[in-house]
Amino acid sequence: MVRPRKLMILAGAAAAGGVVVRHGRRASRGHPMPGGILVGDAVVYDTLSRLLLGPFVARIAADVATVAPDGARVLEVGCGPGHLSIRLARQHGLEMTGLDLDPAMIARARANTDRAVNRGGRRPSLLVGDVAALAFPGGSFDLVVSTLLMHHWADPTGGLAEIARVLRPGARALIWDFRPGVRPHPFGPRHAHIPDPVDHTRGSRLRVVKATPWPWPWRLTLNPADPTGRADKSP
């Protein structure tokens, strides 16, 4: 199985904060599932993600909740059908903003939100947008999160720089993505050539503090930018 890992990022330079990133796709159409399969229909992707990613989303939500301050303003980049944003808003009381490049996916996320809030809880804000040009003022968020998508961004370093910009001083970024060097997949050969996510932090005002095992993905912890671009990796 292709294993993702999490990046925990604290913004450096002018914004000593952090965000979570998970959005922005390359020219390819469709939404990535584990193993590199691209699903082109938002409804089909929503159904598959419920069936295949439910435990993963639950673990991520629990992990985010341990990091986010009470009532924190949180941006999810690449929210897809909204499962993580909805869970974090309803169950953990976070002020969630979910962002996705695909209008059809945001429509699906809004429909899922309508059903979820009927059972009570906070409602996330869901918007169409691109990590390459985040439509938020600087210092807007206490936390940014993203799952399994950074390797699809056209400009990962630029996306991380945008995340650093919208983080408030002292905030964090949590990013889950696949490890480099995974075996090729017949439906997603690009996953055989995934670069190390740490490489994209150089020049983005973010730096990796450590990489540690997470229950089944990997987690990278990033702190304020180091001008040397060094990263400490823990097995």
Locate the predicted segments by residue.
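A short acidic, Gly/Pro-enriched loop at the edge of an enzyme's catalytic core
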Residues: 132-143
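A short glycine-rich, Lys/Arg-flanked "PGG" loop and its adjoining helix->strand segment in the class I
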Residues: 157-169
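A short SAM/SAH-binding and catalytic strip from SAM-dependent methyltransferases
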Residues: 143-154
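Class I SAM-dependent methyltransferase SAM/SAH-binding core
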Residues: 75, 81-133
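C-terminal alpha-helical "lid/dimerization" subdomain adjacent to the S-adenosyl-L-methionine
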Residues: 25-38, 48-53, 174-227
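Conserved alpha-helix/loop element of class I SAM-dependent methyltransferases that forms part
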Residues: 52-70
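Short amphipathic, positively biased membrane-proximal segments
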Residues: 1-34, 230-235
